[in-house]
């Protein structure tokens, strides 16, 4: 397995690039990638995936993975400031091959007016328009399971929406409902949002703001867990896959490590930092043990963490993309710099040695995105889907082990029974032999007495 880094610069003259994290290979390139900060999103980094970019005009530019020039330019109601994709809900009962033409389920976009737009990509229908914030929406994120959509705006609010309530087109009253949760603890604009992966009842929300704080919330209970106070404005953040640390990119070019667990010096026990709404002020780090300074003095625009949590990938407003070791904080790799600030950074796991840049010629264009809300009549709801052949069920390894264990148990249980049966057979043979000898003796005595 390998990891691929996709970074998109700002401005119409830039080119988005995808490069390998563990080698010098360049996987893909996209020319004329006009986009603004956080107004880009990618469905993946393999054949059939797409890159969506939104610039200063009310247009969405769509690229097919592996093709340098754009495939489509789709008009939208107004310029979008951020976007997010929601995958199709998983269903373990469906077991089909991945089709050539595949699209995510939903595309969400936020605007400078505070409106939230949601399109269904398979049909192009506009399924939701909502006045979500009082000011511009800065960031949108779907949870991994697709249950929640979280929006952060310049009005210092974080709103948690239930996806099902937003896309229920046959019940207008459901779409009028307010957000499930609204967090108003920040005092300045929200700059980034991070949602942890895992079970639905244990999703944590991390939000950063220009007020210099990173706040950790529990979505299930709606409670503030911990507030981390940093010395400068927090521009972006990323969380370790195991939840061990949070990495906050600051406005002066520093990336600060915010540990979520520390060893108690009195008890020598590893304990969680904060909790129960505590405010934790991070101490200065003069020895730079928990700080990455390779981007100074340029503002950090994005931070990502590798799959194993040992590598930090970051970008800044000068166009540099750096790879650093999470333990030593030393730079281990520098990618080809962009000519303008990097506004989008994504890291995906891919198959090593595969055709990363291969363009799927049999692809189809996605439907045009509507600018008017869809009719609530479900009989008029048409979607474009490709059905692939069903995969033959493979033997379940766990079931095979269980069957072998049962067979071994049956063999072990048959051994005592076989021993008992052999013992009874031997005893019967002895009795038969003794009876035969006794009969011969009786016949001999009878002949002697008769004579």
UniProtKB/Swiss-Prot annotation:
SUPFAM superfamilies: WD40 repeat-like
Stretches the record annotates as Disordered: 408-428
Keywords: Nucleus, Repeat, Ribosome biogenesis, rRNA processing, WD repeat
InterPro entries: WD40/YVTN_repeat-like_dom_sf, WD40_repeat_dom_sf, WD40_rpt, WDR18/Ipi3/RID3
Residue spans of the WD repeats: 89-129, 132-171, 185-227, 229-271
Chief site of localization: nucleus
Alphabetical GO biological process terms: DNA-templated DNA replication; rRNA processing
Subcellular location: Nucleus
GO CC terms of this entry: nuclear pre-replicative complex; rixosome complex
Function according to Swiss-Prot or TrEMBL: Component of the RIX1 complex required for processing of ITS2 sequences from 35S pre-rRNA.
Family per similarity comment: Belongs to the WD repeat IPI3/WDR18 family.
Subunit structure, as described in the record: Component of the RIX1 complex, composed of IPI1, RIX1/IPI2 and IPI3 in a 1:2:2 stoichiometry. The complex interacts (via RIX1) with MDN1 (via its hexameric AAA ATPase ring) and the pre-60S ribosome particles.
Protein name: Pre-rRNA-processing protein IPI3
Species whose genome carries this gene: Meyerozyma guilliermondii (strain ATCC 6260 / CBS 566 / DSM 6381 / JCM 1539 / NBRC 10279 / NRRL Y-324) (Yeast)
Lineage: Eukaryota, Fungi, Dikarya, Ascomycota, Saccharomycotina
